[in-house]
């Protein structure tokens, strides 16, 4: 979007805080329905980030697929489950939680240091998207593919990692 810089910065901070609060709600709420609604807030904030970065197609896909389908499916699955059996053995803190916290914190710190130490300006893409998109012979689906592999490479990879984690989580839940 072509917004004035102070408004753009305000929206970035607002969406970032909504994203952080929603993700904390997903993890910290003991009621699974509240966690699912917090996940919906996180996914909506991510799609609004895509709108701010002028990738409206990815934002619409995010809203339709994740918020409209996946999150609603999660809410229905949680509503059909018997929740009383999960709260009988509830403990506030275990040794496994501490180990998980240490591992996740170390991964988070290593990712932050890697992101801050990387010179992102030195990355050279093999194709320049402006040169390719100016050609009239390329169809719309090819333009989307070029954008996904050049301009939106990092968000596309992050979405694939989120899908992988969701698949692994679904397998773990299905085995129990």
UniProtKB/Swiss-Prot annotation:
The chain crosses the membrane at residues 10-30, 32-52, 63-83, 92-112, 152-172. InterPro entries: NAD(P)H-Q_Oxidoreduct_6, NADH_UbQ/plastoQ_OxRdtase_su6, Nuo/plastoQ_OxRdtase_6_NuoJ. It comes from the Eukaryota. Keywords: Chloroplast, Membrane, NAD, NADP, Plastid, Plastoquinone, Quinone, Thylakoid, Translocase, Transmembrane, Transmembrane helix, Transport. Its main location: plastid. It is found in: Plastid, Chloroplast thylakoid membrane. It is a multi-pass membrane protein. Pfam families: Oxidored_q3 (PF00499). This is NAD(P)H-quinone oxidoreductase subunit 6, chloroplastic. It comes from Glycine max. The lineage of its organism: Eukaryota, Viridiplantae, Streptophyta, Embryophyta, Tracheophyta. The gene is ndhG.
